[in-house]
Amino acid sequence: MQIKIKSIRNFLFRNKIYGYLITKNDEYFKQPDNLNLDILRKLTDFTGSFGIAMITQDQNYLFVDGRYTTQAQKESGRKFKIIKIDLLKKFIDNRFKKNKNIAYDDRFFQLNFINRFYKGKSNFVPHPFSLPNLKNSNKTEVFEFDKKYHGLNFDKKFKKIKNLIKLNNDEALLISSSENICWLSNLRSKNVYNPIIKSKAILKKNQLFIYCNIKNIKKSSRINKKIRLLDENKIFSDIKYFKK
């Protein structure tokens, strides 16, 4: 296991946290592009397509879909107790006493998932832990999708959205879905695993800003001039600019 359970457990004791949730998703709520970027796999050795690990101060649990219990037991059962993922909430409510903190990194969990637990006995708290920053180091080209496949070009889609939303100069629309961003911009990557560009975007009155892992992107000269590709970490400071 390339990620040490001991380091997570030390983090729990230092911060007086009882348990920590780790999912297979990345910050775009997508599965990793390849196995080398899979944090859950590096922690548990589990190679299935979905799962959630919980490391507590004294136990390790791996919650998986019922289809994967045999596989998970074989791959991870030596160090993890395997439980069906649909029992996760019941397990937490029944197992842990009131006021025990369960932490998670809110970059990797959707709000509707976490909201299921806030009325339970345990306290769910967002608390990032410095897991390895596993990023794809291979550069990939971003290009404009051929017009025979996209139906409408970016300018026409952009105009339709502006007519529908009618943004003022000091307003913007945050887009969190990578698929929606790629549809609007007609951009794709040459990633062999998935052509969708993992990204978030801010749509302003006259421009679309796409925030992605810019260091690993080779930009095509054909990209529309109203589209700007920016570093993914810059989105936080840019969002603050629009706060009133």
Feature-to-residue mapping (PLM):
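N-terminal accessory/capping or targeting/presequence segment of soluble
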Residues: 1-95, 109, 113-242
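Acidic beta-strand-to-loop metal/phosphate-binding motif
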Residues: 100-107, 244
